[in-house]
Amino acid sequence: MLPASLYTPLYHHGMLLVVIGCALLYWDCQNRAGSLTRFNRAAIVVIGVGMIVFIGFRPVNVAFVDMVDYAMVYERVQLGGASSSNDPLFNGLQRLCGQFLSTNGWFVVCAFIYVAPLALAAWRVHGAWAFPVFLACLTAFSFWAYGVNGIRNGMATSVLLLAFAFHDKPVVMFPLMAAAWGFHGSTLLPTGAFLLVRYVKRTEIWLAFWVLCAVVSSVAGNAGEMLVAHYNPYASDDRIEKYIHGSNEEGGFRADFLAYSIVPVVGTLLLAGRTRARTRRLGARVGSGPGLNWMRSRRALSAIGMGSGKRACAQGGRWDWGVASARLGGAGRGPSSGLAAAWESPGGRGLAAPQAKATPGASDRLPGVRLLRTDPFYARLVNTYLLANALWILVIHADQSNRFAYLSWFMMPWVLLYPFVPGKVIHRPRTGLIAAILCGQYLFTYVMGVVINPLRGIL
C-alpha cells in the first residue's frame, strides 16, 4: 500500500496524463468519430475499475481528513455500537457490511457506490459515448475531495445523478432518489429542485433567479444563511447550523466561485446549439432546395393530370387553375390559390417564394437556447443546476459554504459536456470540443489542487 501522502499527487498527475491522452485521441479522430466507440466502451470499464481500486484501498490516514472518523465509526458499529450518522441507508449499509467486511473492504464498497453510478448514469443517456461524460465527472474540481473526505455526500450525489438519468422511468427514479436521501439528507435540495423544474421549464426564469440571488447575497450579506439556519428542515440534525456558523474554513463572498459556477450555463448558451444547428441548416438546404420543390410540383401536376381529373382540369388546351387548386385542397379559384400560388410565386416555375423570417428575441439569438428547447432532459438538468446553485449563493458567506456548493457542483461536468456528446437529440459527437472541454475543466482542477491549495498551506 502506498504512503497516504502520495495519493492526492498521484490522482492529479495520473488524471492529467489520462485527460491529455484522451483529448489528443478525440482531437485526432474528429472525422472518424465512429472508430472511437470501441475505445469508449473499454476505457469506461478500465478507468472506472481503476478509480474504485485506487480510492477504495487507500490507507486510513489523517491526510484524508474525515476518513479517520468514518473508520472509527465503522469499527464501533462492528462491535455493536451505534452510528453517529442520521442517514438511515448509510447506517444500514454500515451494519450490513460490518458483519463480514474489514475497514478497507468497507471503503471499497463506498468507492464503488461513489464511482459506479456515474458510469451507469452516463451510459443510460449517452450509450457508447458515455466515457467522455464519465471522465469529466472523475476530473471535476470536487470529485477527489468527496471521494476521500466527504464520503457520504459523494455517494449520495452519485446515486442522485443515476436517478436523474432515469427521469423517464419514475418507477426507477423515485427509489433511487430515496436511496440518495438515505445516504445523505442534503440531497433533498437537488431532488426537490429536479422535481420542481419539471413544471417550471423556462431556463430564462431560473437564470434570472440565479442572478437575483447573486445580487441579494452581495448586497444583503449573511441574511441568506441566517434564513436557512432558521428554517432548517432537519431540526434534529445540527449539521446545517454547523456548516453555516462554524469556523473551520474561511468564509466571505467568493466572486471566483461565483464565476466558476456560471461557466457551464454560459458555455451552453454560447456553444451548445452549434451542434444541432449545423444539422438543421443542412436539412433545410436539402429539404427546401429548388430541385426538390420543382420535383414536388411535377408530381402534383402529374397526379392531377391522371385519370378523370385530366379532362376536368384541362379545357381546350388551357389549364384551369381553379380545378387544379381544388384538387390540391385549395379553397378558392384562380391563380392565387393552391398550386397556382406556388406556380406564380416570385420564385416562378414551382419554386416556393421566400418567406419572411420572424425576428428572434434576444435570447433566441443564443445558439444554446435551441438545444434547451429541443432536449427536455438537458433543459431540466440545466434548470436544476441553476436552482440548486442559486440557493448555495444565498449562503455563500458561510464558513463552510462549499458543503452547499457541492449540491450543485456535482452536476457541473454533465451540464458542461452534455451538448457535445451523442444523446437523444445530438447524434454526432463534436470530438474537438469534447477534447477542449475535458482539458479546460481539468486544467482548473489541476491548478487548484497542485498549485493554489499547496500555496495556501505555505502562506
Name the predicted role of every residue range.
Residues A63, M67-M72, D87, F194-G305, ...:
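Alpha-helical transmembrane segments and terminal signal-anchor/GPI-anchor hydrophobic tails
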Residues V109-H126:
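Transmembrane-helix motifs of polytopic, lipid-linked glycan transferases
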Residues D66-S102:
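Short hydrophobic/aromatic helix or loop-helix immediately within or flanking a transmembrane segment
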Residues V172-L196, W392-I393:
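Membrane-interface alpha helices of multi-pass inner-membrane proteins
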Residues A208-L212, I426-T445:
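Signature aromatic-anchored transmembrane alpha helix within multi-pass, membrane-resident enzymes
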Residues R38, A122-A140:
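Transmembrane-helix signature of polytopic, membrane-embedded enzymes
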Residues G154, L160-V172:
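Membrane-interface transmembrane helices that cradle and orient dolichyl/undecaprenyl
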Residues G147-G154:
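Short acidic/glycine- and proline-prone juxtamembrane loop motifs at membrane-interface regions
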